[in-house]
Swiss-Prot record:
Pfam families: EF1_GNE. It comes from Methanosarcina mazei (strain ATCC BAA-159 / DSM 3647 / Goe1 / Go1 / JCM 11833 / OCM 88). The keyword Cell membrane does not apply. The lineage of its organism: Archaea, Methanobacteriati, Methanobacteriota, Stenosarchaea group, Methanomicrobia. GO terms for molecular function: translation elongation factor activity. Promotes the exchange of GDP for GTP in EF-1-alpha/GDP, thus allowing the regeneration of EF-1-alpha/GTP that could then be used to form the ternary complex EF-1-alpha/GTP/AAtRNA. It comes from the Archaea. This is Elongation factor 1-beta. SUPFAM superfamilies: eEF-1beta-like. Belongs to the EF-1-beta/EF-1-delta family. Keywords: Elongation factor, Protein biosynthesis. The keyword Repeat does not apply. PANTHER family: ELONGATION FACTOR 1-BETA.
Amino acid sequence: MGDVAAKLKIMPESVDTDLVGLKENLKNVIPAGAQLHGDIVEEPIAFGLKALIVTLIVNDEEGGTEPAEEAFAKVSGVENVQVLEAYRI
């Protein structure tokens, strides 16, 4: 099996969410078998709201990004998590 690069979009609960703190909290819950690739990037959405874009390297096995998605969704301040892209590397 190989590895997969997955790009996830994390939407904060509101414009007032502390993105610096949220980034740190997301880094702290990355599950075993996944690693952060690059920095967590802020992407402007609208009216001051910014999404966080996280790129992870995960194993190419069943349920590859699900542990990370579930861990990120449980972080305080996260509204939702969406996989934008996933491709084999």
